[in-house]
From Swiss-Prot:
Cofactor(s) the protein needs: pyruvate
Species: Thermoplasma acidophilum (strain ATCC 25905 / DSM 1728 / JCM 9062 / NBRC 15155 / AMRC-C165)
InterPro entries: AdoMetDC_fam_prok, S-AdoMet_deCO2ase_core, S-AdoMet_deCOase_pro-enz
EC number(s) from the headed UniProt entry: 4.1.1.50
Cofactor detail note: Binds 1 pyruvoyl group covalently per subunit.
Complexes and interactors: Heterotetramer of two alpha and two beta chains arranged as a dimer of alpha/beta heterodimers.
Highest classification ranks of the organism: Archaea, Methanobacteriati, Thermoplasmatota, Thermoplasmata, Thermoplasmatales
PTM statement from Swiss-Prot or TrEMBL: Is synthesized initially as an inactive proenzyme. Formation of the active enzyme involves a self-maturation process in which the active site pyruvoyl group is generated from an internal serine residue via an autocatalytic post-translational modification. Two non-identical subunits are generated from the proenzyme in this reaction, and the pyruvate is formed at the N-terminus of the alpha chain, which is derived from the carboxyl end of the proenzyme.
Modification type Pyruvic acid (Ser): residues: S64
Molecular functions per Gene Ontology: adenosylmethionine decarboxylase activity
Family the UniProt entry places it in: Belongs to the prokaryotic AdoMetDC family. Type 1 subfamily.
One BP term from GO: spermidine biosynthetic process
Protein name: S-adenosylmethionine decarboxylase proenzyme
Amino acid sequence: MEVGVGIHIIADFYGVDSELIATTERMYPIIEGAVEYGRLTKISSDYYQFRPKGASGIVLLAESHLSFHTWPEYGLVTLDIYTCGDPKTADDAFAYLVDKLRPTSISTRKIVRGDMIEEAGENQIEEAALH
């Protein structure tokens, strides 16, 4: 049985409008909107503007975090969405970002974090019994 503590979505968005991702001013409402749409609990956030263009940001969530980095010169946005609890929250936040950023292609990995908890616990019990 697979047991996990959270869902981690790692994604690269290609072909995104360079003007849309060039500044924190443009990215801020999109990222904050994803947090709201995903019904995530924001603790704090921080954004950084690169010169002449490009942006990075992270939202600390009660459920974990959402972070991004942009490369407008390549039309690239890299995303990290990690949530504990209901996996639908990560999926909803991700879907919101796809809708708002409109990439022409996406590379995605979805990982169940802590999926070996039971297995690790069993191994520890077996090893303790041998000593």
